[in-house]
Design a protein with these regions (language model features):
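Intrinsic-disorder-associated, low-complexity terminal segments enriched in Asp/Asn/His/Tyr and depleted
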Residues: 6-10
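Short, positively charged and aromatic/hydrophobic N-terminal segments
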Residues: 26, 30-31
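Active-site beta->alpha loop and helix N-cap motifs at the rims of alpha/beta catalytic domains
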Residues: 37-200
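C-terminal alpha-helical cap/extension of soluble enzyme domains
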Residues: 37-49, 53-64, 82-87, 269-273, ...
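Catalytic alpha/beta core domains of metabolic enzymes, predominantly
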Residues: 181-182, 193-328
């Protein structure tokens, strides 16, 4: 826990495990149902688009609901496409998406609608990361198969936290290795103690899982531990790690991603991180895409520009302040802000999480950091 943020974000109960699909052949699913993810996607004009997971920025997409708590597909599709056009890639059915409040059928619907919306917008190359976490190995593998057959390219899996006390390092390693071995798409580890019963994967355990699991494609660190990120990037950048190649062409390298926007530049510049998955990306997509662009350019340029560094650090200062505001506000604040400022029809959550009141929302939108970063966001929009 850092700055109390884990207690503010997502207090999500678990649902009962789904039944494992009978007699599913991973090879059959892999080759017949998601060939577009592996071998490219034709746009109808003969052009082939090959999707590849690579460094960048992602937003965990909220699951938009109407006032009866039913899926609002139209708003969901619009939001996914609007962000993707700005370089903010989608993570569907993650913590921000209230995944553990959704049925498996609802997750499948959102996976399918994401791929359909992106393809209809001509965004064939946009990689979809799908949340497939559940409270048993069997149920998690089931969701990985469902995600694969619904158009997702990568699964992101949180540790099963209901029986957190029984999750020894060996149990966690076994869980992730069994999931990745049976998943038809690459698997990203998701370390978020606040939403996994306090389970906090150590850097040593993450490195061991990555070495032994060739279908493990990366990790998202919502623990906020910059030192852990640095240790993982150092270990996976060594020549020795090259002896453990990744299994899938969709994810040819192991990516280490932050889980908050407030240390995006430090993670990329000082920690050799590959980007981040950030709830703040739903509100300020241009600003975060610009911050990553500057940071990655500085980190990879043989002669980095002092002017670029100055710009990156100034932007990071604003991002860190706004990230703190929206972290405190959590999912309710994000949905309220999107409804109020993007014209979305509802800010409804699936209860027991309660919606923001207008009083809370008005206080959020007036916070100095929120206002200042929105000025940058609008400036970037005007200059496009």
């Amino acid at each position: 826990m850092r700055d109390g943020r884990d207690t503010h974000l997502y207090k999500i109960p678990r649902h009962a495990p789904a039944a494992f699909p009978p007699c599913i052949s991973p090879l059959r699913v892999y080759t017949t149902e998601i060939m577009s993810s592996l071998n490219g996607h034709s746009n109808g004009n003969g052009a082939i688009h090959k999707r590849v997971l690579k460094p960048g920025v992602w937003a965990p997409i909220p699951t938009f609901l109407d006032d009866r708590e039913e899926l609002d597909i139209a708003t969901f599709r619009k939001h996914v496409v609007d962000l993707a056009k700005l370089g903010m890639q989608p993570v569907v059915c993650g913590s921000m998406g209230e995944a553990f409040h959704l049925t498996d059928n609802e997750r499948v619907t959102l996976f399918k609608e994401t791929r359909a919306a992106l393809d209809e917008a001509g965004l064939f190359d946009t990689v979809i990361i799908a949340g497939t976490g559940a409270n048993s190995t069997r149920a998690t593998i089931n969701l990985c198969h469902l995600a694969a057959s619904s158009g997702a390219d990568v699964a992101i899996v949180i540790p099963p936290g209901y029986f957190a006390g029984a999750m020894t390092p060996l149990a966690l390693k076994t869980f992730f290795l069994e999931v990745q071995a049976s998943s038809p798409i690459p698997v990203m580890l998701y370390n978020f103690p606040g939403a996994a019963g306090g389970i906090d994967l150590s850097s040593d355990l993450i490195e061991e899982i990555a070495r032994k699991g060739s279908n493990i494609c990366g990790v998202k660190l919502t623990c906020g531990a910059v030192g852990k990120l640095t240790r993982i990037t150092a270990a996976t950048a060594t020549p020795a790690f090259a002896d453990y190649p990744r299994k899938s062409d969709v994810a040819p390298e192991f990516l280490t991603l932050g889980g908050f926007a407030d240390f995006l530049a430090p993670a990329v510049l000082g920690g050799r991180g590959h980007g981040a998955i950030m709830g703040l990306g739903n509100i300020y997509p241009r600003s975060l895409a610009r911050l990553f662009e500057l940071s990655y350019k500085i980190a990879t340029d043989a002669q980095p520009s002092a002017q670029d560094l100055k710009k990156a650090l100034e932007l990071q200062d604003l991002v860190s302040g706004a990230d703190a505001s929206f972290t405190r506000a959590g999912i309710p604040g994000t949905k309220w802000y999107l409804k109020t400022h993007s014209g979305y029809p509802s800010a409804r959550l699936r209860h027991p999480i309660l919606e923001f009141t207008d009083e809370q929302g008005r206080a959020l939108e007036k916070e100095e950091a929120v206002v200042k970063l929105m000025e940058v966001e609008k400036s970037l929009a005007n200059n496009q």
